[in-house]
Amino acid sequence: MKPSRTEVEQAFRGLRDRIVARLTELDGGGRFVRKDWERPGGGGGEMSELRGVLFEKGGCNFSSVHGERYPTVPEGKASEADLRLGIRAPAPEEVAGQPFFATGVSLVMHPRSPFVPVVHLNVRYIEVGQAAWFGGGTDLTPFAPFEEDTAHFHGALREVCGDERYARFSQWAKDYFFITHRNSERGVGGIFFDYLRASEEIFQFVQNVGDAFLRAYVPLVERRQLTTYTENDRQNQLRWRGRYVEFNLIYDRGTLFGLKSGGNIEAIFMSLPPLVSW
């Protein structure tokens, strides 16, 4: 049995509120400014943006939108192993021309220090016609990777996923967060999943992923935030950010879905850093 739209919206808003509260505390000087927006075709959302001391720019957005025609087509077929994990993209004929509902939380944090990693989190729920599924993921993009930080981040995700899901979803992240024209990964990975058919068990799993985010990320910030850096480090960080921008504008599913579905432009481009160079 799938959860109700109201249950999912409430859970996602609660997740947004917990993350915003903890990251505000961590920043120590800035605060998230919330701004409501409405989508002309139906629904809307709430932007929460931080311009802080520790975090040069960050955003944690909630959205809940609906419309008459689903703007994208699911990709690929699931293997038997994927089916065991609950992964099954609906067939194109199931969703073509169908009304849709989508709600989710999307976060990206761009720290000021080159030694504190960029982080991304997304959880989402989509209904199209009679089909309903969850998707999401989280990944780490350090300019200067530390093995112990990568191990901690992935360890927290393995704990919440279990071995089988972690193996599939971490590989999915490696494949998804890949910048083809650069022939390189965006960062040090994480997890990515999509088309998890909606059920109470999957709903709980997605909530658990959201709750694991702070455990995975906050210790890394606390460990690196006082590390000194040079102007050369800063300039290299800005050039590295260019790859983040390239991925988000060319490949990111959330960006493309938002643009195709008439989403809020400010919220869609919230993921972009405030300063970047090539």
Where do the protein language model's features map onto the residues?
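Long, charged, mostly alpha-helical binding arms that flank functional sites
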Residues: R158-F205, P219-E222
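Glycine-rich, often proline-containing surface loops adjacent to acidic residues and nearby aromatics
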Residues: G58-G59, F101-T103, A132-D139, S184-A198, ...
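Internal mixed beta-strand/loop scaffold within catalytic domains of large alpha/beta enzymes
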Residues: E46-G136
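Gly/Pro-rich turn-and-neighbor structural signature
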Residues: K2-G86, E200-I250
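Compact, glycine/acidic-enriched structural inserts
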Residues: G129-W172
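Flexible loop/turn segments at secondary-structure boundaries
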Residues: Y70, F115-V116, T228, R253-F257
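A generic structural motif
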Residues: S4, S113, G129, L140-F146, ...
